Amino acid sequence: MSIIKEFREFAMRGNVVDLAVGVIIGALFGKIVSSLVSDIIMPPLGLLIGGVDFKQFALFLRNAQGGIPAVVMNYGAFIQNIFDFIIVAFAIFIAIKLMNKMRCKQEDTPAAPPKPSAEEKLLAEIRDLLKEQQTRQ
């Protein structure tokens, strides 16, 4: 089997395709959440605490000198990423909770009892014959 044929079979398996779709949707969902946090949530939050833009929060460890750039810790971006994480984690939590709820409803429906196997049928016949013999005696 050639390597190309093996790769094609690997790439076309359902799990790999599902994973690829999940990764793409996850990346796009991340962009949406980042936009939600940076464009919708953080501006009013900054306004509530005095018109502060969290992206601008930084700690200068060393100012620029000559050709050497400044050393800066941008903790405002870190705060914004924390908000991103919290919102994404909450959204995933809700999605999993809904999926589990739907799965439980599906599991609650009683399944039809399994049909007896050939061995079980044979044992039932033997039991019935033994009962008949005992009643005759």
Swiss-Prot record:
Keyword annotations of the record: Cell inner membrane, Cell membrane, Ion channel, Ion transport, Membrane, Transmembrane, Transmembrane helix, Transport
Gene3D superfamilies assigned: Large-conductance mechanosensitive channel, MscL, domain 1
Subcellular location: Cell inner membrane
GO molecular function: mechanosensitive monoatomic ion channel activity
GO cellular component: plasma membrane
The UniProt record lists the keyword Ion transport: yes
Main location group: membrane
InterPro entries found in the cross-reference section: Mechanosensitive_channel_CS, MS_channel, MSC/AndL, MscL_channel
Topology Cytoplasmic: residue spans: 1-16, 95-137
Pfam families per UniProt: MscL
Membrane-spanning intervals of the chain: 17-45, 75-94
All ranges on the Periplasmic side of the membrane: 46-74
Membrane topology: Multi-pass membrane protein
Alphabetical list of HAMAP family matching this protein: MscL
Known function: Channel that opens in response to stretch forces in the membrane lipid bilayer. Forms a nonselective ion channel with a conductance of about 4 nanosiemens. May participate in the regulation of osmotic pressure changes within the cell.
Quaternary structure (record): Homopentamer.
Family classification: Belongs to the MscL family.
Protein's name in the database: Large-conductance mechanosensitive channel
Gene behind this protein: mscL
